[in-house]
């Protein structure tokens, strides 16, 4: 594998010195880019795009051709594991992801297979290998998965949800079934992320998109416990260097201390958490990623730069910060505004690393 020309993203995750704060964007390969729209049209639909190695590689690289980003992230979806378990993933126009066969009972959970990443999910590992080759050491490649709790919400609800009544019913009325499902998902995520690492992912991220809908006690029992299990089960060194692990829980700002105890290297912050406060609380244990409100990219270039400056100032001097949005970039953002954001991070952060 090629030596990395730019490793500041990996260095920042390990709180090692960097020249400027590294930056990438969640959903940086996405619908706000006209070139992505063109490639997606070529694929036919989103799932076909994810499963086409050549096109998934193409869209992963598109934002790097536009912006001086410090990392690439595998183009895929968090729901690949439940799809590989046979739940029948499809996308309903205006509705988001749906499953043909949601999970309702103990029998449903017991019959779920743990997918073999090099069989049912080989399109993902093939894409990782292709992207690593195409990157040629330009920047590191991030692999990722949904967290067991977040995957379970989609599997039990049958898709997206606002109230999460079905999964909370399972959690409170049948906790043993809930734990059986989460345990199986944790095993699947470990295999899946380790396969991505073996295929060439240089860092991995676990997205707990719906962790924030739980009480603190339930979060520890039904989400964090399984994230801890995943961190313990991951390959932490490959190709002669550490493979950093980032945990991101949307709405999880109140649990940073508990999340930092998992042994992960970094925590992703959504925009509702104050980064200065987060650094005071856990900055001696983990790096922090984030955390500009993605909607700030609707603002003027001057206002975007001002917000970048405020967040950099909030984090303060030294390494241990990867700049990002607090969640995925919106599909109607002007690509030029994303460029202003990325360049502002590099331009304004150098003074914090002298």
Swiss-Prot record:
PROSITE patterns: UROD_1, UROD_2
CDD domains: URO-D
Site positions (Transition state stabilizer): 77
Molecular function as annotated in GO: uroporphyrinogen decarboxylase activity
Pfam families given in the database record: URO-D (PF01208)
Claim: Glycoprotein is one of the keywords in the record: no
Cellular component GO terms, alphabetical: cytosol
Binding annotation for substrate: 27-31, 46, 77, 154, 209, 327
Top-level enzyme category: lyase
Superkingdom of source: Bacteria
Pathway noted in the entry: Porphyrin-containing compound metabolism; protoporphyrin-IX biosynthesis; coproporphyrinogen-III from 5-aminolevulinate: step 4/4
Compartmental location: Cytoplasm
Reactions mediated catalytically: uroporphyrinogen III + 4 H(+) = coproporphyrinogen III + 4 CO2
HAMAP family per record: URO_D
Family: Belongs to the uroporphyrinogen decarboxylase family.
NCBIfam families: hemE (TIGR01464)
Alphabetized PANTHER family for the sequence: METHYLTETRAHYDROFOLATE:HOMOCYSTEINE METHYLTRANSFERASE RELATED, UROPORPHYRINOGEN DECARBOXYLASE
Quaternary structure note: Homodimer.
Name of the protein this chain belongs to: Uroporphyrinogen decarboxylase
Taxonomic lineage: Bacteria, Pseudomonadati, Pseudomonadota, Gammaproteobacteria, Enterobacterales
Gene: hemE
């Amino acid at each position: 594998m090629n030596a990395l020309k730019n490793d500041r993203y990996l260095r920042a995750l390990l709180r090692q010195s960097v020249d400027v704060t590294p930056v990438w964007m969640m959903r940086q390969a996405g619908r706000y880019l006209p070139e992505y729209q063109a490639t997606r049209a070529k694929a036919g639909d989103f799932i076909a795009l994810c499963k086409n190695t050549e096109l998934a590689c193409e869209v992963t690289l598109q934002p790097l051709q536009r912006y001086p980003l410090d990392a690439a992230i595998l183009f895929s979806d968090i729901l690949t594991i439940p799809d590989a378990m046979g739940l029948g993933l499809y996308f309903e126009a205006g509705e988001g992801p749906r499953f043909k066969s949601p999970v309702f009972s103990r029998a449903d959970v017991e019959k779920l297979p743990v997918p073999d990443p090099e069989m049912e999910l080989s399109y993902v590992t093939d894409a990782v290998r292709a992207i690593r080759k195409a990157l040629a050491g330009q920047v590191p490649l991030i692999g990722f998965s949904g967290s067991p709790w977040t995957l379970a919400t989609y599997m039990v609800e049958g898709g997206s949800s606002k109230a999460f009544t079905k999964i909370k019913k399972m959690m409170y009325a049948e906790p043993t079934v809930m734990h059986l499902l989460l345990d199986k998902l944790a095993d699947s995520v470990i295999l899946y992320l380790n396969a991505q690492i073996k295929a060439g992912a240089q860092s991995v991220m676990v997205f707990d998109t719906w962790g924030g809908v739980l009480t603190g006690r339930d979060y520890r029992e039904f989400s964090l416990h399984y994230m801890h299990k995943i961190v313990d089960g991951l390959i932490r060194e490959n190709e002669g260097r550490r493979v950093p692990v980032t945990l991101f829980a949307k709405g999880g700002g109140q649990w940073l201390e508990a999340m930092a105890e998992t042994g992960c290297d970094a925590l992703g912050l959504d925009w509702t958490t104050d980064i200065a406060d987060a650094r005071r609380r856990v900055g001696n244990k983990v790096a922090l990623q984030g955390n500009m409100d993605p909607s700030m990219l609707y603002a003027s270039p001057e206002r975007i730069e001002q917000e970048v400056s405020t967040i950099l100032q909030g984090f303060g001097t030294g390494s241990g910060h990867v700049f990002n949005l607090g969640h995925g970039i919106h599909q109607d953002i002007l690509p030029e505004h994303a460029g202003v954001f990325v360049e502002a991070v590099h331009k304004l952060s150098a003074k914090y690393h002298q």
